[in-house]
């Protein structure tokens, strides 16, 4: 049975522990395990979580950050949690939530979880980031870590919605879209409903469910739905155009080169591409420089190619200069410009 592993990211004070406690209170079946990472020697959040739900499997990784010094410990911890005996009558663990420190970057954590043993166990990783509707925009502007957490997220949970007016919340959604147009934004004022959305099962191919058409449609809606977003000065959203006749090997080599050039500046990649040597479009996605297995979208109607790259402090010009003969040509873009080009993708 697949196990969902949620990387719960978010800047300092953005409400990660509160969100985690809300999830644990709603888990009447006791199917959730928790790993809490804190950079200091004293694990305050771990104590708070244990006090809020003292019957859950909980491991504290302290005095180090899982995005750097504790990466090998994390893989061992996940394996040990899955192998640990369950109480009599208890169900198997269905999900594990890793609450990261407020200064962690999700990309290296996802890379450390790309472990063959964890893959064999059917671990499915989703990055959920909390976004503080009081200080979120300031944090993203001032701290690289906050921008990286937002840029790598597959889902962004708005917190402290009760402290801001609806128009302010809409402005924060625009900030999020400017950094990461791929993310599903959870902004439900019904807290229980929001928690369910944030920690919903990812499904066999990632957060989108319902087959190939639904998967591709969700990509388009995430990229092009809604009003044009406010661009972040250091986060670049790039659109890619696939060269006619390019093969899968061409694209795979380009992805390797892209990851090498960008390093930890690469935040997200998501694409649906029709290469010359495959009958079906191929779905590609990454968090940071760690790519999931490509997936053929069987049964998807003919469509234009979609390719979006999100990076920090490196833009399309930099990448094109390094890879002038690449099978995918990148250009800096705003949502409105890409939307116009892609308006007939799923007609």
Question: Where do the PLM segments sit?
Answer:
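C-terminal accessory "lid"/substrate-recognition subdomains
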Residues: 148, 152-155, 161-301, 312-347
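Conserved catalytic-core segment of NTP-binding enzymes
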Residues: 109-182
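A short, charged/proline- and glycine-enriched loop
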Residues: 1-4, 233, 303-304
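Nucleotide-state-sensitive switch-loop elements of NTP-binding domains
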Residues: 2-14, 18-139
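Flexible loop/N-cap segments at domain edges
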Residues: 309
């Amino acid at each position: 049975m697949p196990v969902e592993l949620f990387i719960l990211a978010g800047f300092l004070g953005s409400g990660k522990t509160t969100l985690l406690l809300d999830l644990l209170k709603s888990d009447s079946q006791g199917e959730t395990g928790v790993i809490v990472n804190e950079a200091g020697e004293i694990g305050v959040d771990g104590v708070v979580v244990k006090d809020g739900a003292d019957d859950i499997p909980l491991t504290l990784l302290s005095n180090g950050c899982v995005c750097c010094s504790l990466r090998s410990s994390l893989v061992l911890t996940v394996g040990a949690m899955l192998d640990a005996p369950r109480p009599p009558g208890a169900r198997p663990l269905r999900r594990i939530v890793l609450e990261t420190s407020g200064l962690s970057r999700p990309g290296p954590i996802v890379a450390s979880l790309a472990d063959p043993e964890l893959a064999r166990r059917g671990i499915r990783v989703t990055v959920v980031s909390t976004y503080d509707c009081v200080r979120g925009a300031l944090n993203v502007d001032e701290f690289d870590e906050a921008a990286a957490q937002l840029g790598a997220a597959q889902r962004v949970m708005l917190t402290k919605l009760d402290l801001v007016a609806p128009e302010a919340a809409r402005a924060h959604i625009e900030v999020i879209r400017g950094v990461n147009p791929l993310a599903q934004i959870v902004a439900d004022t019904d807290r229980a409903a929001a928690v369910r959305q944030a920690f919903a099962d990812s499904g066999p191919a990632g957060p989108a469910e319902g087959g190939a058409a639904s998967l591709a449609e969700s990509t388009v809606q995430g990229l092009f739905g809604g009003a044009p977003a406010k661009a972040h000065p250091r986060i670049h959203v790039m659109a890619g155009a696939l060269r006619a006749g390019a093969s899968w090997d061409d694209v795979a080599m380009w992805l390797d080169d892209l990851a090498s050039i960008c390093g930890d500046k690469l935040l997200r990649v998501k694409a649906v591409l029709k290469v010359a040597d495959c009958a079906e479009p191929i779905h590609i996605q990454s968090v940071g420089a760690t790519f999931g297995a490509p997936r053929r979208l069987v049964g998807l109607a003919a469509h234009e190619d979609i390719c979006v790259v999100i990076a920090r402090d490196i833009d399309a010009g930099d990448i094109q200069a390094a890879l002038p003969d690449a099978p995918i040509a990148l250009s800096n873009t705003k949502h409105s410009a890409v939307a116009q080009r892609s308006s007939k993708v799923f007609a």
